[in-house]
């Protein structure tokens, strides 16, 4: 999935057990008090409809569908994120019927061609629109059509986040004993003075990773 993430992402949330992650969040005392742990608008949508989606499958989510990323982009607003999900056998049809089931009937869905790839725009009941990029192997969803276009560009040009040496060097793959991992782009820090010649071009700035664990009292 990281081969889909545009290189300008400022942070990425990764999990390979999204259903368990939702259970962990629902088990927090703050969730039981109706104080939802905010991650993103897309994550809030996922949390709202996940149980219904799981209910539509006889054996729960597939191993592939449990793999999920959310990338965050500038400017930092609730709508500037992309959710990515792997798809296994039969998942394409499941997700397609699920989206159609819950999208608004007020406006018809629209289809756009972008560099030979199809972007679908689904109207939602709250008046917003979801841009979706489907393939048999994955889907990418965003409230911003331009971000889905960037996903397509990253995939076709092979210039994704995983193609950046600074990220690829840091990335070690998902650990099995954590609910999720957050990757954050650190701001660059200039070293030396402008008059120091080559030293002034030295920059400190890369990626950091933080593993997330949950108990009823806290996220750490």
Which residues does each predicted region cover?
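Beta-strand-connecting loop/turn residues
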Residues: 79, 116, 136-138, 217
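Generic beta-strand structural signal
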Residues: 113-114, 132-135, 214
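Long, internal scaffold/assembly segments composed of regular secondary structure
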Residues: 197, 201-220
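Generic recognition of long tandem-repeat/solenoid scaffolds
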Residues: 117-123, 216-220
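Contiguous hydrophobic, core-forming segments of folded domains
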Residues: 3-23, 28, 137, 143-169, ...
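Structural boundary/hinge residues at secondary-structure and domain interfaces
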Residues: 1-121, 168-197, 203
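A conserved glycine-rich beta-strand in the N-terminal activation segment of trypsin-fold
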Residues: 125-194
């Amino acid at each position: 999935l990281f081969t889909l993430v545009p290189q300008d992402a400022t942070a990425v949330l990764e999990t390979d057990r999204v259903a368990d992650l939702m259970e962990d969040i629902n088990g927090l005392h703050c969730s039981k008090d109706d104080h939802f742990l905010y991650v993103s608008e897309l994550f809030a949508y996922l949390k709202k409809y996940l149980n219904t989606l799981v209910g539509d499958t006889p054996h729960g989510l597939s191993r592939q569908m449990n793999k999920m990323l959310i990338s965050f982009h500038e400017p930092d607003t609730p709508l500037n994120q992309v959710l990515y999900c792997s798809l296994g056998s039969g998942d394409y049809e499941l997700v397609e019927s699920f989206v159609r089931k819950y999208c608004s009937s007020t406006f018809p869905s629209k289809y756009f061609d972008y560099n030979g790839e199809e972007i679908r725009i689904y109207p939602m009941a709250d008046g917003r629109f979801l841009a979706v990029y489907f393939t048999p192997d994955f889907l990418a969803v965003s409230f911003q059509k331009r971000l889905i276009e960037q996903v397509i560009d990253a995939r076709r040009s092979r210039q994704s986040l995983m193609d950046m040496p600074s990220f690829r060097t840091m990335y070690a793959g998902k650990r099995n004993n954590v609910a999720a991992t957050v990757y954050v782009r650190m701001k660059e820090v200039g070293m030396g003075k402008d008059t120091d010649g080559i030293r002034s071009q030295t920059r400190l700035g890369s990626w950091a990773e933080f593993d997330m664990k949950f108990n009823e009292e806290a996220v750490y």
